[in-house]
Amino acid sequence: MIEFGNFYQLIAKNHLSHWLETLPAQIAAWQREQQHGLFKQWSNAVEFLPEITPWRLDLLHSVTAESETPLSEGQLKRIDTLLRNLMPWRKGPFSLYGVDIDTEWRSDWKWDRVLPHLSDLTGRTILDVGCGSGYHLWRMIGAGAHLAVGIDPTQLFLCQFEAVRKLLGNDQRAHLLPLGIEQLPALKAFDTVFSMGVLYHRRSPLEHLWQLKDQLVNEGELVLETLVVDGDENTVLVPGDRYAQMRNVYFIPSAPALKKWLEKCGFIDVRIADVCVTTTEEQRRTEWMVTESLADFLNPNDRSKTVEGYPAPQRAVLIARKP
């Protein structure tokens, strides 16, 4: 059973304590009403994992845990089997006592692109919206964050996060809540808010930007990473039924248009930090994610186009500040 009591106790003692006015009731409702049909199977996989305290833990350069003496073949097989019960693994990679989870996305590459542009994370309280399995939460802790909170309603991601946490010695510096941002009150409590790979899934992208702003303290920093297209500040792609085989893609602006959106929502010091094309080396099928991936979503005769004929995915990182 995945519990959230440790998080409640933690925030009761800090500037997030006002969140306790709504959060426990929301989580209780989720536990009663909204659990996925496979959730018990997934949570059992987490429960059956061994409790291990790492001898060496690296969250600065990767997410890697090692034991002082190698685990037995039986222990490794048990961990490997239980983690494979939580497939597909999309965001990573993780290296846990000799079990290497080669995820669909090289999320470490994204982190390497983003990190040089951030304000120092040391001592910060961070919110990561749409955090997936929580890979970047651990990297935020490795970069010095005091507390990293992720929200993502996908319940498999919650179980993946809790599995990794257990194998990292039940580390309580990062937490994942099975919520969407629309369920959060205007906390105005986070020093840095990340939204990476979310905006294009929102029917109302400007509303999403306002929601992100409502989570930041004054002078707080927003890190926004999303799909973009080439063009000027008036360029926005509105795909038809699908984009790269995804149904739930609504608006893909140019980076200059996105900068304008952020300014319209009241952010200041907005800058385009990075723009890069997503490659089939960064997003691909692996033995931990065996279904279709980026290579299957591109036109086989013209890799600069999706199968629908749109520009192939490229992603931008924008940094902005709440006044």
Swiss-Prot record:
It catalyses: carboxy-S-adenosyl-L-methionine + 5-hydroxyuridine(34) in tRNA = 5-carboxymethoxyuridine(34) in tRNA + S-adenosyl-L-homocysteine + H(+). Keywords: Transferase, tRNA processing. One of its GO terms (biological process) is tRNA wobble uridine modification. Belongs to the class I-like SAM-binding methyltransferase superfamily. CmoB family. SUPFAM superfamilies: S-adenosyl-L-methionine-dependent methyltransferases. CDD domains: AdoMet_MTases. Catalyzes carboxymethyl transfer from carboxy-S-adenosyl-L-methionine (Cx-SAM) to 5-hydroxyuridine (ho5U) to form 5-carboxymethoxyuridine (cmo5U) at position 34 in tRNAs. It is an enzyme of class 2 (transferase). Homotetramer. Carboxy-S-adenosyl-L-methionine binds at residues 91, 105, 110, 130, 152-154, 181-182, 196, 200, 315. The keyword Mitochondrion does not apply. The keyword tRNA processing applies. It comes from Salmonella schwarzengrund (strain CVM19633). This is tRNA U34 carboxymethyltransferase.
